[in-house]
Amino acid sequence: MNISKQEQRVLHTLAMGGEIRRYLNEDGKLTEITCFTREGYGLSNCTMDTFKKLKNKKLISSKGGRPYRITPLGATSAQAQMNQR
């Protein structure tokens, strides 16, 4: 599966315990997303476009209205990064 560098960064953050929170307007439409690391810091390169690509590829999912987390398919698709030794 082809995954861009930006998507890999987001997947790696999610694999390390991060989450993606979504914000809806009063009509129930998605207006904003924010990716958080496990320490609570925001990830700036997680855009709406990246979120939609990861969701369409079923690499992330949300259950019961909770924040989006990485799926088992996403965990196997994420490549290891050298800075996490």
UniProtKB/Swiss-Prot annotation:
UniProt cross-references to InterPro entries, sorted A to Z: YjhX_toxin (IPR018654)
Taxonomy, superkingdom: Bacteria
Membership in a protein family: Belongs to the UPF0386 family.
Protein name: UPF0386 protein VF_0869
Species this chain originates from: Aliivibrio fischeri (strain ATCC 700601 / ES114)
